Amino acid sequence: MRLLLCLIFLVFVFNFALSTVHFKDTFDNDWESRWVVSDWHKEDGKSGKLVHTAGKWFGDENQKGIQTSEDARFYAVSAKFPSFSNKGKDLVLQYTVKNEQKVDCGGSYIKLLPSKLDQSAFDGESEYSIMFGPDVCGASKRVHVILNYKGKNHLIKKEINKVETDQLTHQYTLVISPDNTYKVLVDNKEIQAGNLADDWELLPSKQIKDPKQSKPVDWVDVKEIDDPEDVKPAGHDDIPASIVDPEAVKPEDWNEEDDGEWEAPTIANPEYKGEWKAKKIPNPEYKGEWVHPLIDNPEYAEDNELYLFNDLGAIGFELWQVKSGSIFNNMIVTDSVEEAKDFSEKTFVANQEAEKKMFDDLEAAKAEERKKADEKLAAEKAAEKEAEEADEEEEEVAEEDLVKTDDKKEEVKKSTKKVDHDEL
């Protein structure tokens, strides 16, 4: 048993040692020497600026990525690496993205491109080999997997809706294998897998309808016909759809001079049977649904190398973001799933817990600040109300004192008049 485990370990180490990493980037301080920002939309001022940052919350402040920093802008940046073919090997594309802005409309996908890419002119029309990653806009949330086959871009037929929309870092992984299968993983968990031929319309149909065949003119495909022996009953069409309500009575206060001649209301006729239609019977001439004969499609050619990309030489982001704030990092292009997993453990996994804790602490602090602000506002409003009530009370007291003073003056006046009168 121990020998078997040792052999398995040696095979793993051997395969790991033979793996090739075509591209890897964690965006150190020298990242701009490897990445080229496109001139796309610079003239019209719609090109967004990328900044080098770990963001507002992180697991490791030294693990920085590139962040979109301006809203409603286009972003296009790329890096090149030695051209390679994935013939006979797995192709693994992996990267992380953190949408600090709580994205509501914007792409966060990555592209693998051919080596001929003109980096300064890189834009939405540039040819690419693979486009992969999340895209969010309103209610639409999906992971794109678009493959270029023979010069045409093909979107995966299945909806991959497992898009993380919180404000933490998430990792997206695409694996394409020589047996023409694929896997999509989010945070190292498989969310989609299948066969390239089944899940993309890369190949034309094996069979097509024979263009030389058409349904015979005498083909009967009507299942039922009217019963020729069924006859419409006499007087059927004479029955009206509505009749005068026999229970209706002219109101006692009805005045024909003022109200006009009274007419009884009508009701649906219970005897009315609607438009007469003959009963249906099975059609004795019915031959069934005509099926168009199929022939082999002359355009179809089997391809056992749907997975193959002969010239991969660049990687890049070409995005439109309504709301900026996405941070991209930890990219790897390799032929080894194990290599990608190891890279993930050292970068993404190692910082997940610490990043979430920092985020939660910041959110808790914000909540506490909001609570204090609300309490302060409530206290200020209560103080204002109390002051208003005190002012109103003072005004009432002042009015009462004024009335009392006026009453006293009136009494003095009356008393003076009385004295004067008595003296007279």
Swiss-Prot record:
Q: Where in the cell is it found?
A: Endoplasmic reticulum lumen
Q: Name one Pfam family in it.
A: Calreticulin
Q: Per the UniProt entry, what is one GO biological process?
A: ERAD pathway
Among its keywords, does the record have Protein biosynthesis?
no
Region 3 X 11 AA approximate repeats, residue ranges: 260-298
> What is recorded about the protein's domains?
Can be divided into a N-terminal globular domain, a proline-rich P-domain forming an elongated arm-like structure and a C-terminal acidic domain. The P-domain binds one molecule of calcium with high affinity, whereas the acidic C-domain binds multiple calcium ions with low affinity.
| Descriptive protein name | Calreticulin
